[in-house]
């Protein structure tokens, strides 16, 4: 028992140290290995001791010490088998330590009068914890990483913590995360994501880079690489000639390059992040039995891994912003600063983020990027929370990549399609004008006569989208509104936005996109933003907003019978020109109908009995008209909203918006009074009253009101700007 006492006291010393010390430095991890190894030695020695007791007739468990030492071993073995994962892991480690302490105390009580030397030795061994703390302090800064050359990432703003390159082998180990038994589900999800195919394994991106390098300074590609090719950039593989066929060129955005980000330098985007070398356990780059030992060490003591790989910044919108907010400047375009795609600011200044007081619509609680694009998935992966993990499919709208021969994945296509069709956007046949008479909102059936010119209004509203629609590269993405009329035989007799024989969209269609021009006035059609100098138009829709599209149709003579008017909001990831330019063997990319509406044309009068629910349709139309500065139509619409649903405070708020634009401040104030009566302490009321006070020159009152809004919406940029002015 004395020998067992010394051995378990030794284990207790290292165990206590491992329990109370923050897991940093290589010494700590080697001590874990020592603790586990000596634990198995103790298991063998203890088993032999119990066997001897059993043979002598004493029984296996004959004392308190035997019970406690058995529990110590049992909890230790369970911890080794299951890992220190989650609440169960922490409970096992705690019980393992408590039972060991109990054994020591019970033994000291038993031997205190008979063996003073034992106590002195015990105290000495406990003091060993202090020595271990000192050694850990000395070696805390020691690392098993290799110091590389200083970085040159320009024009990318990426930085590393050390200012040196990082070995590619340290940040290109996604497969290890998935095959070590820790994160197989997350790894499988990542394999079916655009992050996996962000680099030169993406033919659309590779073709874009090929064109860039043939028409601009070759170092410009580093500006792209901070987000598309982090392994190559961070390891210095973009110095000199780039090997597009290397393993690293096919790596995409790996686990380590995303989770290795320690901070976001500011909110300018373009990959303006700081990345650190991942924490290294012993034998991180080994194979065979040493690799198994490495995996065991991470499982038994994952705190260092967890603390380094999951930081608070990783759950913030700013984390996604760093690569989903883009600008170009002279180093990229030899021209001037231009704003590229920008999902972050659109989200930040919207009701979705909870920041914008004046938003038309907002969810019941604020949402971040991760809520929509990293929804919870059922998983038993290590580190799961109640059986769920954040999804690493990064659900979005890219159905092009999983349609390619080398990456064909019907499951991915279906998942993206389901995501796009999940209440992201709405299409509504709102109204029709016949011979100067306007009828709205339309019900399921309308009356039209031959030889009549009609104007049909279609409202498109963003609903479940936290940024502008479309997001991403608006020059190559292809969402459009397809409107067509079918007769009783299903034949199309009128159409806008239909496809021709080569799958090009009718160019008279209404597209939700941006048309970018180069210095010659030519369209940017090769994903060549470095040649972009100006934007012809941008038809994107802000989050929680709406657009109205007008169609005219001359109904010919002799047309009678029943018809259907159908409107589809279609989305194709890349327009046909991009597909034909970039793919050696062009394919037909999927076209997803995100939303649709249908109205039947019959020969009896429309039912004009409106329901309260129709108020939202009218409101959406008013929003679209207000965005087009058609104030008369907007005012009429919002007035109807207040008449149809007088309890809807936003109806009066929106009416006040129109009156303020018209300079009718008395009417606006009156509308705000109604809104305040319906919804007391409504921040929108204070904001628009502040606008009125400012326009009337009552600056003290305006300041008071804008400050009032700041208390509930401190991040609202528009309110802050109004206050500053």
Language model features: what each stretch is:
Residues 121-125, 138-168, 186-220, 237-543, ...:
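Primarily the internal scaffold of c-type cytochrome electron-transfer domains
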Residues 611-624, 650:
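Amphipathic alpha-helical repeat scaffolds of TPR domains
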Residues 628-640, 661-674, 681-686, 693-708, ...:
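Structural signature of tandem alpha-helical TPR/SEL1-like repeats
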